[in-house]
A protein has these predicted regions:
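Short, acidic, small-residue-rich periplasmic hinge/interaction motif at the N-terminus
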Residues: 23-64, 84-86, 92-96, 131-133
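Outer-membrane beta-barrel signature, preferentially recognizing the C-terminal barrel domain
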Residues: 410-416, 459, 488-537, 544, ...
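Face-selective signature of the C-terminal outer-membrane beta-barrel domain
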Residues: 240-246, 250-262, 289-448, 473, ...
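Surface-exposed extracellular loop regions of Gram-negative outer-membrane beta-barrel proteins
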Residues: 150-169, 207-215, 225-226, 236-241, 444-446, 476-521, 542-562, 676-690, ...
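Outer membrane beta-barrel strand-and-loop segments of large Gram-negative receptors
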Residues: 227, 359-361, 405-410, 510-512, ...
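N-terminal periplasmic accessory domains that precede
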Residues: 71-74, 114-115, 130, 142-172
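Short acidic/polar hinge/loop motifs at secondary-structure boundaries
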Residues: 71, 77, 105-132
């Protein structure tokens, strides 16, 4: 058989396999096939990026940079996601979003996304999904949408089908660098009707030499100068296990369990200088500062799925999810000689804060196929959520004796019971695809103070949350879509906690128990185009919110800077996101992720307003060098970001990676280097209050270099293979996906 016929046969086989997979509901989420045909291997690889009108999927395992990067590094590449210089994450232009892991909400990840993703190696993740219009099936919380992290499960051949092949795959990975060291392991496999997956990791990060300096000038001429250099240590560990068993041809049961621990030790010795105004000739003081944080999270779930027809288009899923997330924070402040200090009271202190969030979730989802082109989803959900906070304040004597200060201590409990029901209809009519849904959530909330000042209260409220989307396939490889959603944000325990943190003698911070649920509206228009060498996705969005929760600061009568939260902001946001994936040459790929937005923020209650443009640009060039060396070079550039009381300056840094597979592609070696434009990443912030102006400079030692080794093992063939210097199959599969018009297949 000549070469031309071999290529033709390979293409036909790939198309047949993809067509077959689209008409069959599999337990695995993969439609990739790898088979041998008389020494000819046919490989169809998933696209690096799959764009839909209401969801974007970034295939992390297909990106060569994942071998040497963290999940946070990969998020900088993901469309609709922005990561700033302080590792703060926004999704769809909002810092309020929910993090799911393998399709299930994870409170630990949602509470600490930056810290966790910065410690988590990217090779533990299969896909990152950005669901900008989650629809009625998902919880209404999270104004930016849902960030779903799909963990890597190297599925063996036959998993989820009738072929009950036994086997396993796995890998062990280790990273050593100037700032972090980590080790991780993954194993997954199948024994008869049982499939299993387990992973674990440990990361230790050390960052020394971070500096914070600011000057605060008040209307009366009082001036405060502050300088702090700190060292930070962050240990992080995580383990997950999942099991699935096929009870019969129409039903299966699965269970998952995960444990995550996160710690942070922060040490510094700030120096504070006061002068002018009420401070006269002035004075200065220094103090030793220590902060210890420990966070542990456990989550477990069990799911039962039952199909009601052999086509598996009608099915019921019953689910239970449990999660708990306790956090302990200890703050120590010990002052130097304070004999010359006047005007403010200084004394050694210790504060201990314990919080715990616990959730029980029960859910039932039913999917019914009305016809070959229409589908109806409906279901119900109940969440029992309890948040406890115990904050204690201790005065420390000269001999280090600790005495509880009950007047400044507080203990309270916040409970939420949420009952939800939804219905969602999806249809596909030729080139048109549509989805309409509605969700209603009723919340019963109660706050009870066990100790400290505060009034117990009960309240209940309901939220009707509509969603809709419409898509049209203009031509093969080209579509356009529009979607609308209403999202809500319930204030968490951090915002509600009315405990007053007095660890800083010149400032206090506290939460607000009177916060209301935030309601945000978002309208997006999406355009997708791609051919065998070029992909373009553009999203135009407009969002508005009239009761956004903002953190704001003001000076009180005692000249203390108060920082708290309130539903005080009205926001309007117009945005454009552009993603380009261009196969310039056979071995050269260029990627661009550009986000541009205009924000208008106003607060009638505070009398403040601010507005301005900001942009974030990621440009990435991937090149295959001789000897199959994979080389990447890229840059992240962000402009000034505006908030209600000021702005944060832009930033820029560069990175490069070099990867090589050896030992019959069982061992991957990857080298990564990242550096800002200066020796440290410089971040400047300006805050303007009614009676003060503050300018802050933060310098972060961001420069990193690391080496990663990954050993792959197993007794089955890998189902997923990296496409070498060719993304033709990526776009072929994506072109088939776009013709579904948004209808799941």
């Amino acid at each position: 058989m000549n070469k031309k016929n071999m290529i033709l046969l390979s293409s036909l086989l790939v198309c047949s396999l993809e067509s077959f997979a689209q008409n069959k509901v599999e337990a695995t989420d993969s439609i990739l096939k790898d088979m041998d045909l008389d020494a000819v291997t046919v490989v169809a690889s998933k696209p690096l990026v799959k764009m839909e009108t209401d969801k974007m999927t970034y295939n992390v395992e297909q990106d060569a940079d994942a071998k040497a990067s963290t999940v946070l590094d990969m998020l900088r590449k993901v469309p609709m996601v922005t990561v700033d210089g302080q590792d703060n994450i926004t999704v769809n232009g909002s810092s309020s979003f929910k993090v799911y892991v393998d399709g299930k909400p994870n409170p630990m990840f949602s509470a600490n996304p930056s810290q966790i993703f910065k410690a988590m190696p990217a090779n533990m993740v299969k896909n990152i999904e950005v669901i900008t219009n989650p629809g009625a099936k998902y919880d209404a919380e999270g104004t930016g949408g849902v960030l779903n992290i799909v963990l890597n499960k190297q599925t063996v051949n036959g998993a989820g089908g009738n072929d009950l092949s036994n086997g396993y795959n796995g890998n062990i990975s280790a990273t050593a660098g100037n700032q972090a060291q980590s080790i991780s392991a993954l194993i997954s496999g199948q024994q008869g009707k049982l499939t299993y997956s387990a992973n674990g990791m440990y990361n230790y990060q050390k960052m020394n030499g971070t500096t914070i300096s600011f000057d605060r000038t008040q209307k009366d001429g009082s001036l405060m100068n502050y300088y702090q250099e700190s060292d930070m240590k962050q240990p992080f560990s995580m383990g997950n296990i999942s099991l699935s068993y096929e009870l019969d041809s129409l039903s299966n049961i699965s269970a998952t369990a995960g444990l995550t621990t996160f710690g942070q030790k922060l040490n510094g010795h700030p120096l504070t200088q006061m002068s002018g105004g009420i401070y006269g000739k002035g004075f200065e003081y220094g103090n030793e500062m220590k902060q210890n944080l420990d966070n542990t999270s456990f989550n477990g779930s069990i799911d039962y799925q039952r199909f009601f027809n052999k086509e598996r288009t009608n099915y019921l899923i019953l689910s239970y999810l449990f999660s708990t997330n306790p956090t302990h924070i200890d703050n120590y402040t010990f002052y130097d000689d304070i004999s010359q200090v006047t005007g403010i009271q200084l004394h050694d202190l210790l504060s201990k804060s314990k919080t715990r969030g616990t959730e029980h979730t029960f859910q039932a989802d039913f999917t019914h196929s009305l016809s070959e082109t229409q589908r109806l989803n409906f279901g119900a959900k109940y969440i029992a959520r309890t948040n406890k906070s115990d904050s204690r304040y201790y005065d420390v004597a000269a001999d280090k004796t600790e005495t509880l200060n009950p007047a400044n201590s507080m203990e309270y409990k916040n409970t939420q019971n949420i009952l939800a029901a939804y219905a969602e209809w999806k249809g596909n009519f030729g080139k048109w695809g549509t989805m309409m849904g509605t969700r209603y959530e009723q919340t019963w909330e109660k706050v009870k103070f066990e100790q400290g000042k505060g009034e117990d209260f009960n309240k209940q409220y309901g939220n009707l949350v509509p969603s809709a989307s419409l898509s049209y396939n203009i031509a093969p490889g080209m579509n356009i879509g529009m979607n609308y959603q209403l999202r809500i944000t319930r204030p968490g325990i951090t915002y509600l906690n009315s405990y007053v943190d007095r660890s800083n003698p010149t400032a206090i911070s506290y939460g607000n128990t009177d916060l209301d649920v935030v309601k945000s509206h978002q309208l997006n228009m999406v355009f997708n185009y791609y051919n065998q060498r070029f992909m373009l996705s553009t999203t135009l969005g407009y969002g508005f919110c009239d009761n956004k929760i903002e953190q704001y600061s003001f000076l009180d009568a005692d000249n203390l800077l108060n920082t708290t939260y309130g539903n005080v902001s009205k926001t309007r946001n117009a945005s454009m996101n552009v993603f380009i994936n261009w196969l310039m040459f056979k071995k050269t790929r260029l990627m661009l992720n550009e986000s541009l937005s205009y924000n208008d923020l106003r607060s009638d209650a505070l009398g403040w307003k601010n507005n301005g443009w900001n942009s974030s640009t990621m440009i990435n060039l991937q090149q295959t060098l001789p000897w199959e060396l994979q080389w990447t070079v890229g840059s992240i550039i962000q402009t000034k970001q505006h908030n209600l009381q000021g702005y944060q300056s832009g930033m820029a840094f560069f990175y490069t990676t070099l990867s090589k597979s050896i030992v019959k592609e069982k061992l991957d070696l990857s080298l990564m280097f990242l550096t800002p434009t200066d020796d440290k990443l410089n971040i400047k912030q300006k805050t303007v209050g009614s009676d003060y102006v503050q300018n802050m400079t933060i310098k972060v030692p961001l420069r990193q270099i690391s080496l990663t080794l990954t050993w792959k093992f197993g007794n089955t063939k890998k189902q997923f293979q990296q496409a070498k210097s060719n993304i033709k199959n990526d776009f072929q599969e994506e072109q088939q996906g776009i013709q579904t018009g948004g209808m799941e297949k």
